[in-house]
UniProtKB/Swiss-Prot annotation:
It comes from Danio rerio (Zebrafish). One of its GO terms (molecular function) is proton-transporting ATPase activity, rotational mechanism. It comes from the Eukaryota. The lineage of its organism: Eukaryota, Metazoa, Chordata, Craniata, Vertebrata. GO terms for cellular component: vacuolar proton-transporting V-type ATPase, V1 domain. This is V-type proton ATPase subunit C 1-A. Subunit of the V1 complex of vacuolar(H+)-ATPase (V-ATPase), a multisubunit enzyme composed of a peripheral complex (V1) that hydrolyzes ATP and a membrane integral complex (V0) that translocates protons. V-ATPase is responsible for acidifying and maintaining the pH of intracellular compartments and in some cell types, is targeted to the plasma membrane, where it is responsible for acidifying the extracellular environment. Subunit C is necessary for the assembly of the catalytic sector of the enzyme and is likely to have a specific function in its catalytic activity. Keywords: Acetylation, Hydrogen ion transport, Ion transport, Transport. Coiled coil: none annotated. The modification N-acetylthreonine is found at T2.
């Protein structure tokens, strides 16, 4: 279970008492959740007006940063293609897995100095994550173009003999070249019609060179045959071939063109390999940065909301709960009983959400008498 509930409640005589009460209610007898203290440093409070405005801004920033974290994670999965099982081991925060980072969260004083105002810290995070978002768009666009061009070429070299590139199948010796009168055509013949082809190709038109057919290549359904004839008989031969279910490919042997195609394929393939390593490294580093920023926003939101709800001086205990999946409903009830005295208006809302009234919006349903934010470490939506 990778879902965490980050909550806070006011300090009793001491914050330790608040913690002990939660532990007794949720773990001592009933194993409802695994709990950790969530350490938030002494941040600068500022004025009430600023806190109220900041509360809304942080909610928007939270949603934006979460979306960037998910985008980076999803793009990592896209880039790693066949090794999706390796994605999780690349999605780390500060070199540790996400659950470990969240449960052992320590504020990063170097990145987000607590001498700065709350607004400044939120602006630092906003700027940092916007940069990651913009960089991701640019890098993804460049890599996707490269990958798309390579896939188009690969598609040309695969598929049916009726449409695929023939550059890697034919060679110069298969053709009569530089003749004023003669030309070699390539004909796709269904496997079931091989006998018909061998029996009739010389008589499909006048001026077909006898015994000039060779089988160059086969796929599941068809074979690619050569046939040499006089140029003036091409149209007649095409027409008769079509009537007999033989398809003449439009193909002119051009060594330079085929060489250029092969070189382009090699170049794109090499470029993709060259870009792959640095791109995965960039994604790892910036996933970590974005995820760390996201958890710091959660910490800021808990701090701001706790001050707005519980007042000054700052005295609350932030706690991180990892609910036991089978007991989530029970855990909500226990937390409600523990903290309902904090906010009487929450009682009505809890009762309503239990009844599941249609049209009651989620933000209202997710209002509790204690400060609550969800952190979900499952960031990948594998189709």
């Amino acid at each position: 279970m990778t879902e965490f509930w980050l909550i806070s409640a006011p300090g009793e005589k001491t914050c330790q008492q608040t913690w002990d009460k939660l532990m007794t209610a949720t773990t001592r007898t009933n194993n409802l959740s695994t709990n950790n203290k969530f350490n938030i440093p002494d941040l600068k409070v500022g004025t009430l007006d600023v806190l109220v405005g900041l509360s809304d801004e942080l909610a928007k920033l939270d949603a934006f940063v979460e979306s960037v974290v998910k985008k980076v994670a999803q793009y990592m999965a896209d880039v790693l293609e066949d090794s999706r099982d390796k994605v999780q081991e690349n999605l780390l925060a500060n070199g540790v897995d996400l659950v470990t980072y969240v449960t052992r969260f320590q504020w990063d004083m170097a990145k987000y100095p607590i001498k700065q105002s709350l607004k400044n810290i939120s602006e630092i995070i906003s700027k940092q994550v916007s940069q990651i978002d913009n960089d991701l768009k640019a890098r993804a666009s460049a890599y996707n173009n490269l990958k798309g061009n390579l896939q188009n070429l690969e598609r040309k070299n695969a598929g049916s003999l009726l449409t695929r590139s023939l550059a890697d199948i034919v060679k110069k010796d298969d053709f009569v070249l530089d003749s004023e009168y003669l030309i070699t055509l390539l004909v796709v013949v269904p496997k079931t019609n091989y006998t018909d082809w061998q029996r009739t190709y010389e008589t499909l038109a006048e001026m077909v060179v006898p015994r000039s057919t060779n089988l160059l290549f086969e796929d599941h359904d068809s074979g690619l045959f050569t046939v040499t004839l006089f140029r003036k008989a091409i149209d007649d031969f095409r027409h008769k071939a079509r009537e007999n279910k033989f398809t003449v490919r439009d193909f002119q042997y051009n060594e330079e063109e085929m060489k250029a195609d092969k070189e382009e394929m090699t170049r794109l393939s090499t470029d993709k390999k060259k870009q792959f390593g640095p791109l995965v490294r960039w994604l790892k580093v910036n996933f970590s940065e974005a995820f760390i920023a996201w958890v710091h926003i959660k910490a800021l939101r808990v701090f701001v909301e706790s001050v707005l709800r519980y007042g000054l001086p700052v005295n609350f205990q932030a706690m991180l709960l990892q609910p036991n999946k089978k007991n989530m409903k029970k855990l909500r009830e226990v937390l409600y009983d523990l903290y309902k005295h904090l906010d009487s208006s929450a009682a009505a809302i809890i009762d309503q959400s239990a009844m599941d009234i249609p049209g009651l919006n989620l933000s209202q349903q997710e209002y509790y008498p204690y400060v609550y934010y969800k952190i979900d470490c499952n960031l990948l939506d594998f189709k």
